Amino acid sequence: MVNTIKKSKGVFIMVEQDTIRLLRECDAGVKMGVSSIDDVLKYVKSERLRKDLTDNREEHCKLDKDLQELLDQYHDDGKDPNPMAKSMSWMKTNMKLVMNESDHTIADLITDGCNMGVKSLNKYLNEYKAADEKSKDICKRLINLEEDLTIQMRQFL
């Protein structure tokens, strides 16, 4: 009986740790996505591209609300994007747009960012297998948002 309780507690702790870790990575991903969209919006010329980006940004924000509720349940503050990754993204965005301020360039940058996000989120989904289903669902929803935006960007490439 004692071994079962210890094992059960160990499993519970593992689930909670993986859940929090996955939620943190999703939090950083949502923030990075919103920030990246914000960085390019002022350069957008096409109303269709502006609408696609704005709609996706709103979906990121809705998902962030659900994410913050789950993080609050675990008394966790979440995670900001890696400062180095964020500054490198900002530099790449601004350098490319200074050289070629076009919707094509914006679509290219957003596609690259989404692909990196999808890759990272799938890695974390595989790494934190013990995470609860709610956090896995949030992660999958974020992956779908990124994949959908990539598809929307194709017409501007």
Segments from the language model and where they lie:
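Alpha-helical scaffold segments that form or flank carboxylate-/histidine-based iron centers
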Residues: 18-26, 47-65, 103-109, 134-145
